Amino acid sequence: MSTSSKLSTNIKDLSLFDLEEFPARSYIGGKWVTAASGKTFDVENPGLNETLAPVTDMSVEETRKAIKVAHEAFLSYRNSDIKERYAILRRWYDLIMENADDLATMMTLENGKALGDAKGEVVYAAKFIDWFAGEALRISGDSSMSSNPQNRIITIKQPVGVVGIITPWNFPAAMITRKVGAALAAGCTVVIRPAAETPFTALALAKLAERAGVPAGVLNMVTANSPSEHGIELTTNPLIRKVSFTGSTNVGKILAKQSSSTLKKLSLELGGNAPFIVFEDADLEKAADALMACKFRGSGQTCVCANRIYVHSSVYDAFVDLVTERVSKFKLGYGLDAGVTHGPLISEKAISKVKQHVEDAVQKGGVVVTGGKVASNLGPMYFEPTVIINAKQGMLISEEETFGPVGALFKFDTEDEVVAWANDSPVGLAGYLFSKDISRVFRVGEALQVGMVGCNTGLVSDVLSPFGGVKESGFGREGSKYGISEYLDIKSLTISTL
């Protein structure tokens, strides 16, 4: 069966992904274009370990062209009617929801996540467009008196300019809408470089933006298989005034250094190593349920996944039983198959890291109570959901983000001890704590050195909540009423009486 035939059995509208014919194209200046070189790269289906379809592989020069086009479009779009921005974003939201099934199916094909997870992400992604449509109408400044009685001060907010957006593969829809929704609402134009692993979901969002009436040049998308070269262009081109990146801390540091040459405004949402603390007075059933969503969602491939699970020694054994019981009920398999709860990891590199963390834990005294190996009967990218007990500080899993379906449970005895362990990390994105003591919830919640804390919940991501970290997890906030501010400059006008 040909590639297009395989796709058409799962996807209703191949045109949504620019797959009526191959390769899929990039979107620059309101036109769908292929690389002048004719180069393409293949996108893989990790669930079947086979090629999904080819995509055009654009050059750095073509990214440079997209930046110029975006700059030209910005000169008019920055002055666009905010009510028109609202209307366009609302149409985009409606189109995303109308095409949710195809978007989720493609996400499963190229990312591997179970279809239920993919459908949840599409809805989550659409909500950011809906939210920022409203935020376009709420951009406001203020006025004030001056220390000089003859002067008045007026403060206004203006779009920063062209924004370079670099997105990851683990949330191929939501990471685009969370950034682009805010940028377009603010009056900025964008050049997007989606992850090479998951370009089709991104291209579909560009198609729907075009259908919604986003003006030519306002949203541009460049697909490429050489991220570092295109990243250099986005971070050093003087026409780009802001870069927004979600990805690893190491890459974020490189982009920040490159951006310093032109002092660009930056939003960096980087890696985490989230502590998940279960105190002796916690509702253990609720905490175990929360851990399933927090640790194993997307097969553990999210930046806010619990990575270090600290359980008070008095409830440790009981909590291990609850967690093991739940994990053993997961169904690992191909994301489009009925009943599957967890899919494959994205690549062999991801598999290797998870194996390394499990092997290191076992060598240092950890015990695997369920899972712990590649499910080779399903394919090379499938790793069994795993629970490790007797975990200790000093294991790799306590020091590095695993980014896989491995839950390691550590014992602790005192609040001071566990807070110190939780904060003993160079990163600080998310943290979680479970306790019925409201004083402890506030005390520990404020003590954790992270940007987001889930208190008696395993879910911290919400359209209305500011998303972002501290320390080496980056800076800037996305979503919420604060998200649009990342794309606005504040200008003061001091006016004297004549």
UniProtKB/Swiss-Prot annotation:
One of its GO terms (cellular component) is mitochondrion. It catalyses: succinate semialdehyde + NAD(+) + H2O = succinate + NADH + 2 H(+); succinate semialdehyde + NADP(+) + H2O = succinate + NADPH + 2 H(+). One of its GO terms (molecular function) is succinate-semialdehyde dehydrogenase (NADP+) activity. The active site is at residues 269, 303. PROSITE patterns: ALDEHYDE_DEHYDR_GLU. Keywords: Cytoplasm, NADP, Oxidoreductase. SUPFAM superfamilies: ALDH-like. It is found in: Cytoplasm. Gene3D superfamilies: Aldehyde Dehydrogenase, Chain A, domain 1, Aldehyde Dehydrogenase, Chain A, domain 2. NAD(+) binds at residues 247-252. Catalyzes the oxidation of succinate semialdehyde to succinate. Can utilize both NAD(+) or NADP(+) as a coenzyme. Functions in a gamma-aminobutyrate (GABA) degradation pathway that allows growth utilizing GABA as a nitrogen source. Functions in the GABA shunt, which allows to bypass 2 reactions in the TCA cycle by removing alpha-ketoglutarate from the cycle and feeding succinate and NADH back into the cycle. Belongs to the aldehyde dehydrogenase family. Homotetramer. This is Succinate-semialdehyde dehydrogenase [NADP(+)] 1. It comes from Schizosaccharomyces pombe (strain 972 / ATCC 24843). The gene is ssd1.
